[in-house]
């Protein structure tokens, strides 16, 4: 493919992500809530003069053939996830956990087709839904701020609550059961931290099992939730217990959008793209 400037579009369930690729690098990004997205939202980035649009995601069917005179490439979502994660992380081979509304696990290696290994309904949507039901504010940054102040000991049952003996490989803070200690004394901050921890442990442990099966240690985390400091803090507790390395690349929320463009620029993969 001759194009060197592409606009990648990830039509997600919760949000639409845009990434402008030029000279092999992401130079601009934008995000629009899915419920508010209009095709006219592309106009600002289209002024940069991309030669084509690479679109992926659940809502990619909104683009058909050409748009504003530009060719539209339909890129398989798992291919976009793999290409974006590897390009932004600089890794040659890795398991990718795409944490969006739910979570998808993809095995990616340069020069090989991406493979979808499976997924989970637990993700960012779970976190927002739980917080709204608990009477909290379903806003990622506010949830993160609350969770940073919370105390897991007020909500989760840990090994240290059950025994004072040392258990090899399982330190006292290891969770036995999420929310099993939840009582009336737990604050909204404690609930927020417990909810984030539930998502982190589910994503983290599923990644551990998938990484073992694929015989890989590097796990790239992409999506908006993974950029929250409290998410990174809690998921790295999984890393301390298991032989995996979690990576959060720059522009992680836009990895799939960028990946659509990176994938479309790969000549050997053009046969997988719907024109």
What are these regions (language model features)?
Residues 72-78, 236-259:
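Conserved phosphate-binding/catalytic loops in two-lobed NTP-binding clefts
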Residues 15, 55-63, 209-212, 216-238, ...:
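Glycine-rich phosphate-binding loops at beta-strand->alpha-helix junctions
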Residues 1-2, 71-97, 102, 106-115, ...:
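Conserved phosphate-binding catalytic cores of ATP/NTP-utilizing and phosphoryl-transfer enzymes
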Residues 2-40, 114:
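Short glycine-rich, Thr/Ser-proximal phosphate-binding strand/loop in the N-terminal lobe
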Residues 82-88, 127-131, 246-275:
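Glycine-rich phosphate-binding/hydrolytic loop that grips phosphoryl groups
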